[in-house]
């Protein structure tokens, strides 16, 4: 296996550890200092290089000859799609890892994905591509008074704007539709440690902006493991608190949601998907019906969670995709409310006196836990610290994600 990541999230390391615990040889491809490099027992750590990122990916594939590759953020998926078009020799591996290549354009284009979801009977908000301010005005008149503007390929709440007026919508459209400039790409590479910023500057198409009808309710997420169009395991959660209004979940509750599972099954089957995928929903406040907002074409932060009666998605995927015996799953999480690590630490939400929340700390691997609790490697470097003294990063506040409800006392 080869785990590949460029975003500085912990989720790839947590999932990779599950594979290693099952006896799977898991090499990694990431920037220097990335959490994947701290997974105990992982194989060789290959370096994703800023000035030759696609070449780095191909070199790692040549060296490892993996049975499968697990992309841990959207940009790696985009590079795999690019490699699929350019280098036929890697197509069997990418097919085995991601599924039917005809799905590539659908899973990375929100409007197409939601249109297909609607065709198979999944509740979705009205969504339309927008290419001009005049078009936006017409669409907002129909979709407002509150709407959501998004760009394809964004994640963790970036590239998302919730707007309450046409004026706000126009400002958001201007910001989101502006292509990344060379100066911004260099800043992201040097300060933020974004390995693929220069590659995206050279190769990414102009930002694709969509406008979506706002759905009142509270967020929910699902992550699925699937093999050749069949779901082999899933985790569904409702989000109790998150990093801001559009950011990543911090505290979640595991739920049994047949409608969310059915939506995942329908999409996976229709698109012939393999690998790990995340689905974002809003549970309607009036009807309790989950409405699908988008699909993330890679693993999310739920993949390592071991649930009663199921185990973790990593183990289920290993057994089905590789045909390997995986043995008993890790101990199941003892409570349904989970404080996701390391977000709880970084946002100061760890409280050892709380018996109703299970804090998702990898206690069996203290060195990894210590590393993940630190700021991301780029933020620790002198240049980034000096930069942020001059331009302070935006403060992220944890919010209750459920309207008019207490997030288990948070």
Q: What does each model-found stretch correspond to?
A:
Residues 130, 160-165, 225-227, 254:
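Short beta-strand-to-turn element immediately C-terminal to the catalytic PLP-Schiff-base lysine
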Residues 245-250, 255-279:
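Oxyanion-binding "anion nests"
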Residues 269-304:
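Conserved metal-phosphate-binding beta-hairpin within the catalytic cores
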